Swiss-Prot record:
It comes from the Archaea. Part of the 30S ribosomal subunit. Keywords: Ribonucleoprotein, Ribosomal protein. This is Small ribosomal subunit protein uS10. InterPro entries: Ribosomal_uS10, Ribosomal_uS10_CS, Ribosomal_uS10_dom, Ribosomal_uS10_dom_sf, Ribosomal_uS10_euk/arc. Belongs to the universal ribosomal protein uS10 family. GO terms for cellular component: small ribosomal subunit. GO terms for molecular function: structural constituent of ribosome; tRNA binding. One of its GO terms (biological process) is translation. The keyword Ribonucleoprotein applies. It comes from Halorubrum lacusprofundi (strain ATCC 49239 / DSM 5036 / JCM 8891 / ACAM 34).
Length: 102
């Protein structure tokens, strides 16, 4: 049977966990096998910028960062389960990618 690999990425780990709970609920209701969610390493994007706009004075810096959290879920590619998976409400800051594998 084919497997569907679901990759979730977003800046809020709470939103990712909510979506993972929805996917687990879909798998339980349809009776398909599920493995995961597997937490992948968090990627930290950091941008240092000067506080002074004109470049004069002492070199003081601000550091802005954004953390991207990722989760990986493998689920059996049952037609009913995938159809329900496509209807899950996903927040704007979460990206979801579904890939079918043999």
């Amino acid at each position: 049977m084919q497997q569907a690999r679901v990759r979730l990425a977003g800046t809020s780990p709470e939103d990712l966990d909510d979506i993972c709970a929805d996917v687990r609920e879909i798998a339980d209701s349809t009776g398909v096998a599920l493995s995961g969610p597997i937490p992948l390493p968090t990627k930290t994007l950091e941008i240092p910028s000067r506080k002074s706009p004109d470049g004069e004075g002492t070199a003081t810096w601000e550091h802005w960062e954004m953390r991207v959290h990722k989760r990986l879920i493998d689920i059996d590619a049952d037609e009913r389960a995938l159809r329900q998976l496509m209807r899950v409400q996903v927040p704007n800051d979460v990206s979801i990618e579904i890939v079918l594998e043999d």
